[in-house]
Amino acid sequence: MAIKHHCYNEGDVFTKPLHPEKYKLYYVWRSSQKHEVWLQIFKYQNTDREQYIIDLFGLDNERTEEDLEEIRKWETFFKHNKIPFTIGGVMWRWMMIQAGRKNGLKFYGQPGTGKTTICNALVYPWHNAVINTVQAVKNPSFMFQDCIGKSMILMEEPWFEKEVCEEMKKLLAGDHCHTDIKQGHQTTVAKLPVLISTNFFQMGGPSLEYADHAALKDRMVTYTIGKRLIPSVLFKDFKTQTLTNKGLYQFIWAHKDDKN
């Protein structure tokens, strides 16, 4: 069986703890055992987010040539979209919940520009909740119920009406918000980083007023991904033409202290 550094599926195996004081890692065969292991890892994610990421990707190790190439590919991607490398520092402070009242990170652009690639790489190591248009329209009262006990929130093409706007503002500002639970009581959603991927500049339906849109905008950092991603052209001078999850975190780590 292949060696893994994180547990996503039943049967994944750990050879040793990455951080013995925080982890206990086992062969995982039954769902009950899997649940027990995940609880330990999720607790680690939320109590020591920085050390969790450092351990997971080996960010405090000396960089290899492969690591440096992965960083350069992400730098090429951001340069291609005229996004400064200070985005690395923005993403680091955001995921560590150190971004103050701007707790939302939004990537806006047309299909095929690489928004999904960035978002998938960012949420890859986290226990995340996904909120999309269908959920928001069908169950507005329960829009945030899947966010309970998670480490990050991903919103894909979010579209919501006035009835949940105030709770959305709280979530994007880094405040605790409330959600209804099916067959349960109203529950508090803890402060979590919110990642947004959308083809639309504004979020929300016609019931939202100008002041609502302005308040939502003030609670997010927005980046426009404006150029189509064609890896075979953009990365033709590199050994590989794929943007990797680890590469993005290596890029973030390299630029985590950069500020505008």
Which residues fall in each region the model found?
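P-loop NTPase catalytic core of nucleic-acid-dependent motor ATPases
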Residues: 1-143, 148
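Hydrophobic positions in the central parallel beta-sheet of the AAA+
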Residues: 153-155
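Alpha-helix capping/termination and helix-coil
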Residues: 95, 123-130, 151, 162, ...
